[in-house]
Amino acid sequence: MSETINTAAQFPSFEKPTVQFNEKGWGPCELPDTFKDVPYQPFSKNDRLGKICDWTNTSSNDKKYQNKYASSFGTGNQYSYYHEEDETTFHLVDTARVQKPPHQRGRFRNMRNSRSGRGRNARGGLNTHGMTTLSGKNVKARDPRHGRGMGKKFGHRGPPPKMRESSVAVRADWASIEEMDFPRLIKLSLPNIKEGVDIVTCGTLEYYDKTYDRINVKNEKPLQKIDRIVHTVTTTDDPVIRRLSKTVGNVFATDAILATIMCSTRSNYSWDIVIEKVGDKVFMDKRDHTEFDLLTVNESSVEPPTDDDSSCNSPRNLAIEATFINHNFSQQVLKTGDQEPKYKFEESNPFISEDEDIQVASVGYRYKKWELGSDIVLVARCEHDGVLQTPSGEPQFMTIKALNEWDSKLANGVEWRQKLDTQRGAVLANELRNNACKLAKWTVQAVLAGSDQLKLGYVSRINPRDHSRHVILGTQQFKPHEFATQINLSMDNAWGILRCIIDLVMKQKDGKYLIMKDPNKPIIRLYDIPDNTFDSDDSDDGEGDDEGFQQVYNYAHNKI
């Protein structure tokens, strides 16, 4: 068998390509039609072409190398995307939460604290076996849902801050002179201020009934409504200060006004004080028909009372209730009656005439002066609420105040009926947190008056929903200077704040000024206001000057 070889088979031929010669440069002379109008983009062979998508891992571990897949040349802008707002494509979407079926509820609940989306006991997840866990108390403290711990750090937002209203509306014709922020006021100090010297003493005091020291939660006593007149006369309306201003001092005020200024760094609510400069004399006044004399409730609390005027637990209604309780308590704990002994000062009550037959509250007035340096002499009217007879026969003057419990659940406080007898310190500490400004002002008033004791009463509602009936659950007494140290109240700083404001006003021209605490910022502002501002007889354009505040009561003669 033989094989036949076909020699006529054709082999593939090689055609020599045509090489174009470019005399003017390099590269081809003509561009093929398939590559016309195609933009050129520089590239590098080392550039990564893409990234593998991992749909199971939601965490990003490439934060340090976010440009890992970018071009090395930084070019190619012709392919970049630029966002332009297109209103034609705008449409609303339904944001309502879709109810999950029962089998999917709580499916990923245990994956919050695990890294990279793994479970607690999965591979690479968080293993809780053999680990020390936090106690329930610590978990509550660290949980952002409870308002503490690291809630704000991780974006957990709380309720929006409440915008408080100003105590007086700032008008266009008022000129702002100075702004004093609290951090700067806290650093002020005026040490070595001696005790005030008595100039005039007026009024009559009743003796304290020691049986109220034995009151406790199990032996409570109802709070009585005592019909007595309490005078809260401002500085320029005081006849004694008018008389003393001709011979003694160059700065005049009352203890309530001084305490408000000295404790201004602890206040949250807005307040204002009118100052008149006449020559080298300065008079500090409160405006008529304002809420200056009302006692605030839970002013410094983390959750202050809600602004609902229809509720008995609104800030204004609670302030009226606290003032009512304070006035009645300070008179009930005294020995009243015509046969009971009384302590009389040198002069009678300056706010009542001899022919008036009215029952006045037990109040003793001390007009004292202080040397503040730089020829500044302060004259102020201070008050005592009662007197205590000591075994040695010497009288001890008292400042009597009352703390009130309205609703411990709404106030986020301590229930007095459970803790007052056994843990009184915890109750007082809670009150110091919620009413820091009010307690500080009471302490300053007691120190200015030279009281030997500061008597605090604990008064609570019989029913949390009834704000008209109250009971006395206990009393507690302190020495004013020791209590000031206990609540971290520096009298040197208080005098420094007062001296700073006095020096600022002394540099101004004669006229009327107003100090106001900003309702929402820790700032005190000094305004230059027209001389006829807040005058009751000013009725230009039929528009009263007292538009900025709401008339509450005439506290010049207020019955309780």
From Swiss-Prot:
Keywords: Cytoplasm, Initiation factor, Phosphoprotein, Protein biosynthesis, RNA-binding. One of its GO terms (biological process) is formation of cytoplasmic translation initiation complex. Residues 291-305 are annotated as: RNA gate. The modification Phosphothreonine is found at residue 128. One of its GO terms (molecular function) is mRNA cap binding. GO terms for cellular component: eukaryotic 43S preinitiation complex; eukaryotic 48S preinitiation complex; eukaryotic translation initiation factor 3 complex; nucleus. Residues 100-121, 147-156 have a biased composition (Basic residues). Coiled coil: none annotated. Pfam families: eIF-3_zeta (PF05091). It is found in: Cytoplasm. Its main location: cytoplasm. Residues 98-166 are annotated as: Disordered. It comes from the Eukaryota. mRNA cap-binding component of the eukaryotic translation initiation factor 3 (eIF-3) complex, which is involved in protein synthesis of a specialized repertoire of mRNAs and, together with other initiation factors, stimulates binding of mRNA and methionyl-tRNAi to the 40S ribosome. The eIF-3 complex specifically targets and initiates translation of a subset of mRNAs involved in cell proliferation. In the eIF-3 complex, eif3d specifically recognizes and binds the 7-methylguanosine cap of a subset of mRNAs. Component of the eukaryotic translation initiation factor 3 (eIF-3) complex. The eIF-3 complex interacts with pix. PANTHER family: EUKARYOTIC TRANSLATION INITIATION FACTOR 3 SUBUNIT 7 (PTHR12399), EUKARYOTIC TRANSLATION INITIATION FACTOR 3 SUBUNIT D (PTHR12399:SF0). Belongs to the eIF-3 subunit D family. The RNA gate region regulates mRNA cap recognition to prevent promiscuous mRNA-binding before assembly of eif3d into the full eukaryotic translation initiation factor 3 (eIF-3) complex. This is Eukaryotic translation initiation factor 3 subunit D-1. It comes from Drosophila simulans (Fruit fly). The gene is eIF3d1.
